[in-house]
Protein backbone atom coordinates (compact mmCIF):
# COMPACT_ATOMS: atom_id res chain seq x y z
CA UNK A 1 0.00 0.00 0.00
CA UNK A 2 1.44 3.38 -1.00
CA UNK A 3 1.37 6.44 1.27
CA UNK A 4 -1.46 8.14 -0.59
CA UNK A 5 -3.67 5.05 -0.16
CA UNK A 6 -2.66 4.82 3.51
CA UNK A 7 -3.82 8.40 4.09
CA UNK A 8 -7.09 7.80 2.21
CA UNK A 9 -7.69 4.63 4.26
CA UNK A 10 -7.11 6.43 7.57
CA UNK A 11 -9.30 9.33 6.46
CA UNK A 12 -12.13 6.96 5.56
CA UNK A 13 -11.79 5.06 8.84
CA UNK A 14 -11.84 8.10 11.11
CA UNK A 15 -14.45 9.91 9.02
CA UNK A 16 -16.74 6.91 9.64
CA UNK A 17 -16.25 7.59 13.37
CA UNK A 18 -17.60 11.11 12.96
CA UNK A 19 -14.30 12.99 12.60
CA UNK A 20 -14.15 16.23 10.64
CA UNK A 21 -11.46 15.84 7.95
CA UNK A 22 -9.42 19.04 8.07
CA UNK A 23 -6.53 20.06 5.82
CA UNK A 24 -3.01 20.78 7.06
CA UNK A 25 -2.67 24.14 8.83
CA UNK A 26 -0.65 26.65 6.84
CA UNK A 27 1.89 27.84 9.43
CA UNK A 28 5.18 26.01 10.17
CA UNK A 29 5.06 23.73 13.20
CA UNK A 30 7.13 20.97 14.77
CA UNK A 31 4.27 18.53 15.39
CA UNK A 32 0.62 17.93 14.56
CA UNK A 33 -0.24 18.69 18.20
CA UNK A 34 0.68 22.32 17.58
CA UNK A 35 -2.05 22.81 14.99
CA UNK A 36 -4.93 24.94 16.31
CA UNK A 37 -7.17 21.98 15.38
CA UNK A 38 -5.54 20.18 18.32
CA UNK A 39 -4.04 22.82 20.63
CA UNK A 40 -7.00 25.22 20.73
CA UNK A 41 -9.81 22.70 20.29
CA UNK A 42 -8.57 20.57 23.19
CA UNK A 43 -9.28 23.50 25.51
CA UNK A 44 -12.65 23.85 27.22
CA UNK A 45 -15.75 21.65 27.41
CA UNK A 46 -16.87 21.65 23.76
CA UNK A 47 -16.85 18.26 21.99
CA UNK A 48 -14.49 17.82 19.03
CA UNK A 49 -13.56 15.10 16.54
CA UNK A 50 -10.96 15.76 13.87
CA UNK A 51 -8.48 13.94 11.63
CA UNK A 52 -5.84 15.55 9.41
CA UNK A 53 -2.39 15.12 7.88
CA UNK A 54 0.18 17.58 9.24
CA UNK A 55 3.61 18.22 7.70
CA UNK A 56 5.90 18.67 10.71
CA UNK A 57 9.16 20.63 10.44
CA UNK A 58 12.07 19.77 12.70
CA UNK A 59 15.07 21.80 11.51
CA UNK A 60 17.55 19.99 13.80
CA UNK A 61 16.65 16.68 12.11
CA UNK A 62 17.62 17.92 8.63
CA UNK A 63 20.31 15.72 7.09
CA UNK A 64 20.61 17.09 3.53
CA UNK A 65 18.54 14.09 2.34
CA UNK A 66 21.47 11.78 3.11
CA UNK A 67 20.08 9.94 6.14
CA UNK A 68 17.62 7.10 5.39
CA UNK A 69 15.60 7.74 8.56
CA UNK A 70 15.91 11.43 9.50
CA UNK A 71 13.94 14.21 7.86
CA UNK A 72 13.70 17.99 8.15
CA UNK A 73 10.01 17.56 7.38
CA UNK A 74 7.99 14.44 8.06
CA UNK A 75 4.24 13.84 8.02
CA UNK A 76 1.88 12.91 10.82
CA UNK A 77 -1.70 11.71 10.63
CA UNK A 78 -3.41 13.26 13.61
CA UNK A 79 -6.67 12.24 15.28
CA UNK A 80 -8.26 14.13 18.20
CA UNK A 81 -11.47 13.04 19.89
CA UNK A 82 -12.99 14.91 22.85
CA UNK A 83 -14.27 13.50 25.09
CA UNK A 84 -12.24 10.33 24.70
CA UNK A 85 -14.45 7.32 23.87
CA UNK A 86 -14.17 4.19 26.03
CA UNK A 87 -13.39 2.00 23.00
CA UNK A 88 -10.64 4.19 21.55
CA UNK A 89 -7.98 1.46 21.59
CA UNK A 90 -10.25 -0.87 19.63
CA UNK A 91 -11.01 1.92 17.13
CA UNK A 92 -7.26 2.39 16.72
CA UNK A 93 -6.67 -1.34 16.18
CA UNK A 94 -9.50 -1.27 13.60
CA UNK A 95 -7.54 1.43 11.74
CA UNK A 96 -4.52 -0.90 11.61
CA UNK A 97 -6.76 -3.68 10.28
CA UNK A 98 -7.96 -1.29 7.56
CA UNK A 99 -4.29 -0.79 6.61
CA UNK A 100 -3.87 -4.56 6.28
CA UNK A 101 -2.18 -5.09 9.65
CA UNK A 102 -3.93 -7.85 11.61
CA UNK A 103 -3.22 -7.42 15.35
CA UNK A 104 -3.56 -11.19 15.83
CA UNK A 105 -0.67 -11.82 13.45
CA UNK A 106 1.71 -9.14 14.75
CA UNK A 107 3.35 -8.14 18.01
CA UNK A 108 1.54 -4.91 18.90
CA UNK A 109 2.52 -3.35 22.22
CA UNK A 110 1.37 -0.26 24.08
CA UNK A 111 4.53 0.95 25.83
CA UNK A 112 3.98 3.57 28.54
CA UNK A 113 5.42 6.90 27.45
CA UNK A 114 3.90 9.90 29.19
CA UNK A 115 4.13 12.94 26.96
CA UNK A 116 5.12 16.54 27.53
CA UNK A 117 5.58 19.58 25.31
CA UNK A 118 7.24 22.19 27.57
CA UNK A 119 7.13 24.99 25.00
CA UNK A 120 3.32 24.75 24.77
CA UNK A 121 2.61 23.92 28.42
CA UNK A 122 1.10 20.56 27.40
CA UNK A 123 1.24 17.20 29.14
CA UNK A 124 -0.60 13.90 29.10
CA UNK A 125 -0.62 10.21 29.93
CA UNK A 126 0.21 8.05 26.98
CA UNK A 127 1.77 5.16 25.18
CA UNK A 128 3.98 4.53 22.22
CA UNK A 129 2.47 1.84 20.01
CA UNK A 130 5.08 -0.63 18.81
CA UNK A 131 4.47 -2.87 15.80
CA UNK A 132 6.91 -5.80 15.67
CA UNK A 133 9.50 -3.70 17.51
CA UNK A 134 9.03 -0.42 15.60
CA UNK A 135 7.24 2.63 17.04
CA UNK A 136 4.41 3.62 14.68
CA UNK A 137 2.02 5.70 16.79
CA UNK A 138 1.84 7.94 19.84
CA UNK A 139 -1.32 7.62 21.92
CA UNK A 140 -1.98 10.41 24.46
CA UNK A 141 -4.71 11.43 26.87
CA UNK A 142 -4.31 15.19 27.32
CA UNK A 143 -4.27 16.31 30.94
CA UNK A 144 -3.05 19.84 30.33
CA UNK A 145 -2.96 22.13 27.30
CA UNK A 146 -1.51 25.63 27.44
CA UNK A 147 -1.25 25.25 31.21
CA UNK A 148 -5.01 24.63 31.52
CA UNK A 149 -6.43 21.40 32.91
CA UNK A 150 -8.33 19.44 30.25
CA UNK A 151 -12.00 18.91 31.13
CA UNK A 152 -13.07 16.67 29.48
CA UNK A 153 -9.94 14.78 28.47
CA UNK A 154 -9.11 14.61 24.74
CA UNK A 155 -7.40 11.60 23.24
CA UNK A 156 -4.75 12.19 20.57
CA UNK A 157 -3.56 9.51 18.16
CA UNK A 158 -0.52 10.45 16.08
CA UNK A 159 0.57 8.10 13.31
CA UNK A 160 4.08 8.60 11.94
CA UNK A 161 3.24 8.28 8.24
CA UNK A 162 6.72 7.64 6.85
CA UNK A 163 7.55 5.25 9.69
CA UNK A 164 4.34 3.27 9.25
CA UNK A 165 4.86 3.23 5.47
CA UNK A 166 8.40 1.90 5.96
CA UNK A 167 6.89 -1.08 7.73
CA UNK A 168 4.00 -1.62 5.30
CA UNK A 169 6.21 -1.27 2.20
CA UNK A 170 9.19 -3.05 3.80
CA UNK A 171 11.65 -0.29 2.86
CA UNK A 172 14.71 0.69 4.87
CA UNK A 173 15.24 4.09 3.22
CA UNK A 174 12.47 6.65 3.68
CA UNK A 175 13.28 8.19 0.28
CA UNK A 176 12.46 4.88 -1.46
CA UNK A 177 8.89 4.88 -0.14
CA UNK A 178 6.19 4.98 -2.81
CA UNK A 179 3.94 8.00 -2.27
CA UNK A 180 1.64 7.08 -5.13
CA UNK A 181 2.04 5.24 -8.42
CA UNK A 182 5.10 6.67 -10.19
CA UNK A 183 6.22 8.96 -7.35
CA UNK A 184 8.53 8.25 -4.42
CA UNK A 185 9.27 10.35 -1.34
CA UNK A 186 12.60 11.16 -3.01
CA UNK A 187 10.83 12.52 -6.10
CA UNK A 188 8.59 14.75 -4.03
CA UNK A 189 10.75 15.92 -1.13
CA UNK A 190 14.48 15.32 -1.68
CA UNK A 191 15.21 18.75 -3.17
CA UNK A 192 13.40 20.54 -0.32
CA UNK A 193 15.13 18.34 2.28
CA UNK A 194 18.54 19.29 0.89
CA UNK A 195 17.80 23.01 0.52
CA UNK A 196 16.19 23.40 3.95
CA UNK A 197 19.19 21.65 5.51
CA UNK A 198 21.57 24.06 3.74
CA UNK A 199 19.45 26.98 4.94
CA UNK A 200 19.14 25.72 8.52
CA UNK A 201 22.79 24.87 9.10
CA UNK A 202 24.65 27.20 6.72
CA UNK A 203 22.93 30.23 5.20
CA UNK A 204 20.26 31.35 7.71
CA UNK A 205 20.79 34.84 9.13
CA UNK A 206 20.98 34.44 12.91
CA UNK A 207 20.62 38.16 13.68
CA UNK A 208 17.51 38.34 11.50
CA UNK A 209 16.03 35.25 13.21
CA UNK A 210 16.57 36.74 16.68
CA UNK A 211 14.87 39.93 15.48
CA UNK A 212 11.98 37.94 13.98
CA UNK A 213 11.47 36.05 17.24
CA UNK A 214 11.08 39.31 19.17
CA UNK A 215 8.81 40.79 16.49
CA UNK A 216 6.56 37.71 16.44
CA UNK A 217 6.46 37.67 20.24
CA UNK A 218 5.33 41.31 20.42
CA UNK A 219 2.67 40.77 17.76
CA UNK A 220 1.32 37.67 19.54
CA UNK A 221 0.92 39.67 22.77
CA UNK A 222 -0.66 42.61 20.94
CA UNK A 223 -3.28 40.44 19.23
CA UNK A 224 -4.10 38.63 22.48
CA UNK A 225 -4.73 42.03 24.05
CA UNK A 226 -7.16 42.59 21.16
CA UNK A 227 -8.89 39.28 21.97
CA UNK A 228 -7.84 37.83 18.59
CA UNK A 229 -6.85 34.29 19.46
CA UNK A 230 -6.14 32.81 16.04
CA UNK A 231 -3.85 35.60 14.73
CA UNK A 232 -2.06 35.57 18.10
CA UNK A 233 -1.57 31.80 17.95
CA UNK A 234 -0.17 32.02 14.41
CA UNK A 235 2.58 34.24 15.82
CA UNK A 236 3.20 31.81 18.69
CA UNK A 237 3.77 29.09 16.06
CA UNK A 238 6.13 31.42 14.19
CA UNK A 239 8.05 32.07 17.44
CA UNK A 240 8.35 28.33 17.99
CA UNK A 241 9.64 27.63 14.46
CA UNK A 242 12.07 30.55 14.62
CA UNK A 243 13.39 29.24 17.94
CA UNK A 244 13.84 25.79 16.36
CA UNK A 245 15.86 27.32 13.51
CA UNK A 246 18.09 29.20 15.96
CA UNK A 247 18.48 26.12 18.13
CA UNK A 248 19.41 23.93 15.16
CA UNK A 249 22.01 26.50 14.08
CA UNK A 250 23.58 26.35 17.55
CA UNK A 251 22.90 30.06 18.05
CA UNK A 252 21.27 29.61 21.46
CA UNK A 253 23.28 28.58 24.53
CA UNK A 254 22.01 25.99 27.02
CA UNK A 255 21.16 28.75 29.50
CA UNK A 256 19.39 30.89 26.91
CA UNK A 257 17.48 27.87 25.61
CA UNK A 258 15.49 27.54 28.84
CA UNK A 259 14.57 31.21 28.67
CA UNK A 260 13.37 31.03 25.06
CA UNK A 261 11.27 27.93 25.75
CA UNK A 262 9.71 29.76 28.72
CA UNK A 263 8.88 32.75 26.49
CA UNK A 264 7.07 30.52 23.98
CA UNK A 265 5.31 28.67 26.81
CA UNK A 266 4.11 31.92 28.38
CA UNK A 267 2.67 33.00 25.03
CA UNK A 268 0.96 29.62 24.56
CA UNK A 269 -0.56 29.83 28.03
CA UNK A 270 -1.90 33.32 27.37
CA UNK A 271 -3.42 32.14 24.08
CA UNK A 272 -5.03 29.14 25.80
CA UNK A 273 -6.52 31.36 28.51
CA UNK A 274 -7.74 33.91 25.94
CA UNK A 275 -9.28 31.17 23.78
CA UNK A 276 -11.15 29.72 26.76
CA UNK A 277 -12.44 33.16 27.75
CA UNK A 278 -13.57 34.00 24.20
CA UNK A 279 -15.40 30.66 23.82
CA UNK A 280 -16.98 31.16 27.24
CA UNK A 281 -18.28 34.58 26.17
CA UNK A 282 -19.95 32.84 23.21
CA UNK A 283 -21.56 30.37 25.62
CA UNK A 284 -19.46 27.42 24.36
CA UNK A 285 -21.74 27.12 21.29
CA UNK A 286 -20.61 23.64 20.23
CA UNK A 287 -22.01 22.23 23.48
CA UNK A 288 -25.40 23.04 22.00
CA UNK A 289 -24.43 21.69 18.59
CA UNK A 290 -24.49 25.22 17.17
CA UNK A 291 -22.00 26.89 14.85
CA UNK A 292 -20.54 30.32 15.42
CA UNK A 293 -19.74 33.21 13.17
CA UNK A 294 -16.39 33.41 14.98
CA UNK A 295 -15.26 29.93 13.84
Curated annotation (Swiss-Prot):
This enzyme's EC code(s): 6.1.1.14
Metal-binding among keywords: no
Record localization: Cytoplasm
SUBUNIT field: Tetramer of two alpha and two beta subunits.
Main location: cytoplasm
Gene (UniProt): glyQ
Organism: Bacillus subtilis (strain 168)
Reactions listed under catalytic activity: tRNA(Gly) + glycine + ATP = glycyl-tRNA(Gly) + AMP + diphosphate
Alphabetical list of CDD domains matching this protein: GlyRS_alpha_core (cd00733)
Protein name stated in the entry: Glycine--tRNA ligase alpha subunit
Residue intervals passing through the bilayer: none
Amino acid sequence: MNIQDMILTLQKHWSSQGCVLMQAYDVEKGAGTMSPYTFLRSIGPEPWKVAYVEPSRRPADGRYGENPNRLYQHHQFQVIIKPSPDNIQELYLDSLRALGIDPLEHDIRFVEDNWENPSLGCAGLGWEVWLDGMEITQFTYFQQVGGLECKPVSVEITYGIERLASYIQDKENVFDLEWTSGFTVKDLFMMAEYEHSVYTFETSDVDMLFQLFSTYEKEAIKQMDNGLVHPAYDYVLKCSHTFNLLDAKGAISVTERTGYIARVRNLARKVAKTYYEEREKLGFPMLKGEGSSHE
